[in-house]
Amino acid sequence: MASEDGEMPSQFEGIDPEQLTESQMQQYMMEMQRQGLLDSNMEGGQYEEGYEEGQEGEGYGEEYGDQDYDGNQNEYDSQQDSQQQGHDQVNEMHQDRYDRRVNSEISGNYEADDETLRKIRRDLLDNINLERRHRDLQPVYIDLTTNNISQYYSEYLVNNEHNQDFYENAKVRYNNLGECELCHITAKFEPDADITKEYIYDYFMEIGYLFLESEEEKRIILNPANNHIGIGVFFDEIQIVVVLILSEKVLCIQKISQPEQNKIEIRGKMLDENFGIYAIRIMNVDDQKKDIKGVGPEFIEYTRSTQEWMASFELELYNQDRMAIEYYTRVSPDSIPYKKKQSKNEKLTYKHLQLRLRTPFQIYPDPKYAAEDEKERIRKEQEILAHEEQERKEREENDAKRLKQSRKDYGDGQYDDDEHGQDDFNSQSDISDKDKHHDSMHAEQEQNQQAAQQQQDTISNKEIRQELEMAITEAQRQHDEFMLQNHKLQEEIKLLKNKNDGFVDRSNETAMNEHKYLNTLAHVHQIRLDLKQTQTRYNQMSQELQKKLEQKQKKCNEIKYAFLELKREVAKKAANSRTDKPIPEQQINEWEKAELQKSKELQELRLQILRLRNAYVKNQKILKKKEELAEGLHLIDFEQLKIENQTLNEKIEERNEELHKLKKKNTTTIQILTHTREKLGFVQGENGELNSQNVRKDQELDDMRKQLTQQKKTKDKLRSVNLTLKQQTGIVNSEELGQDYRDLRTRVSKLEEEKKRLEQKLRSMHEAIKTANQISTQNMQSQNNSLKKPYQPY
């Protein structure tokens, strides 16, 4: 992966871009675009298409040979300005995230990490499912596709208003399948709020509950048909955004893992018993007709009782194509031949299957979730152990105080008996009666305490006896399994020890470890029982409060509607004081609408008052903290802090100016690169024409060489014939031969002149061919240099 400072990715260092494959070139362009080294307005096809195919690449204008560079550049600029700006803002947001993190460290504000955002998304999902469970609805599952769309759209909403076209384009961009419903909320931070990790988390949770305040969004979230959800959360220094996308699917994906190298395992569940999973297709996102892998029912295990299924197959992951997974279903799952081998002649087809779900190819759930769950589990266990330890200490202290008090009471009684014995030695019967009385009172006190303690123990034992027996049974079963496994491992250890130095008896250590294990196991089960009891108690309290709230809400709505009806009836029966005419129905409706609007405004004002009150309390706490911190500081310290703050602000401005210069330089470089690519296409076109001319000239030269050879052969034949004739007859005595000889000489001279002319023409053609070859070589060298060396701006 690329570094945050915009350096070249390590896998592409020292590689000529012309030597990359198409998929590697796309990955290279995406990485350069993510780092901000390429303009995000330009699509991937603009860097790949050329003029060799005779097509008009997007952003290039018309063919370079017909118009000059200025015309092409103007058309290119107009096309670039007409593209949507939303995708650019989302891409630039990732690039500026590092700068915002640096600025947040300088200014003291908190920049939430990915772990916090993941926790926010998971807790929002838990809250939604908890609300659905209270209404006896099925939980919603994560849809990986809409999850990516919602996160992408939340990043867009940080700097923009809701745009339905952009939302639809995002669905197409991520290959969404089926209909879905959108809910979103944008909320600004409270003024002068201390932006911390806890504040951001609490604010997200508070805003999440606002979805249930709106009737439309509440209907979407609590719709029984919706069983999948995508959650997107994002924020900047002034506001937060929460996006929910809900949809209906017939199956859900529970896990996508890679247990072994080049092996994929997918687990899921059918949410509709009338359908069964039949096939899984791995496809190329860029070319959806290209199948990377397709598996049928012979690779799928299906459990009809739980409607859960698992698909396991081999898949080579060395290619760099962007992949997606498609899930095909068929009716009547009982008739699908799961885990049955099919003949080699049978080919998997998707023609009569129903495409129900499409997800991106990625590991799910994220492996980072497991580490975070483990941390959360350890933290909760530590809290439970600390709470248990604190309760144990409190019980011990109470027992010690109670025992000390009882001993003190008993000691006071004995002291009183001794005083009475010293005052009246003769009244032994009274003393013995008093001793018996004190003894009986003390015994009765102890009996009462023991009875109360026994009663408490009996009540607590009755409450947890059944669960404790179940836990002990489960612990005993696990203990037996562990003992059996331990016995097998000990047998293997014995064999290994006998081969080496013999077996050393460790029975005492094993018994001690077993004793520790049993104690720890009992302690863990006790903690689990206490946790379960506490959770059950809290759930009961929550359900009771929820029922009370619903009853009060229902009663409130009834009273509200009754009051509205009463007002309407009174208004209908009322008459105008001037005209004695009844009030029109339209006027009553307008009054009701105005009253409803005022009630909404009143509700918003109440909510705003609550927020302002909370902000007031927080500001008071912050002010107290600042007052406590400012006790040891003096005026000179504040002046020094002010100077340092000003210095840091100047550095920030300098960095922003440098960043602006780099962006301008980047834009200029992109324009030069585009112009060079256009010029390269034009030069390649000229080079092709010159090559075609060169081929034609070579053909003409070959034809003329053949003619010259034929003429030479004819000349040789005529020369031999002439020699023969000379030998047969003399030239002096024959006027015809003399005339013929003179004609031949004239013809030979003409042919020699023609030969010289053709040789001169041949030399000129050779020079033209040589010049064309030199031009072609220079063009190829300039092309290679332009691709290998960085361009300097004009």
Curated annotation (Swiss-Prot):
Region (Disordered): 1-105, 386-458, 774-794
Subcellular location: Cell projection, Cilium
Family matches, as InterPro entries: CAP-like_CFAP184, CAP_sf, CBM-like_CFAP184, CC_domain-Cilium_Assoc, CCDC113/CCDC96_CC
Segment forming the signal sequence: none
Disulfide cross-links: none
Low complexity bias (residue ranges): 24-35, 446-456
Coiled-coil region list: 461-613, 638-775
Keyword terms: Cell projection, Coiled coil
Pfam families: CAP-like_CFAP184, CBM-like_CFAP184, CCDC113_CCDC96_CC
Ranges of compositional bias, category Acidic residues: 49-69
Phenotype on disruption: Mutants swimming speed is reduced compared to wild-type with trajectories wavy and kinky. Cilia length is not affected.
Compositionally biased spans, kind Polar residues: 774-787
Basic and acidic residues: bias regions: 89-103, 386-411, 431-445
GO cellular component: axoneme; ciliary basal body
Domain of life where this protein originates: Eukaryota
GO BP term (any one): cilium assembly
Protein purpose: In complex with CFAP263, acts as a regulator of ciliary beating that connects radial spoke 3 (RS3) to the inner dynein arm (IDA) and the nexin-dynein regulatory complex (N-DRC). The complex is positioned parallel to N-DRC and forms a connection between the arch at the base of RS3, the IDA tail and N-DRC.
Family the entry assigns: Belongs to the CFAP184 family.
Subunit structure and binding partners: Forms a complex with CFAP263; the interaction is required for functional activity in cilia.
Name used for this protein in its record: Cilia- and flagella-associated protein 184
Organism of provenance: Tetrahymena thermophila (strain SB210)
Gene: CFAP184
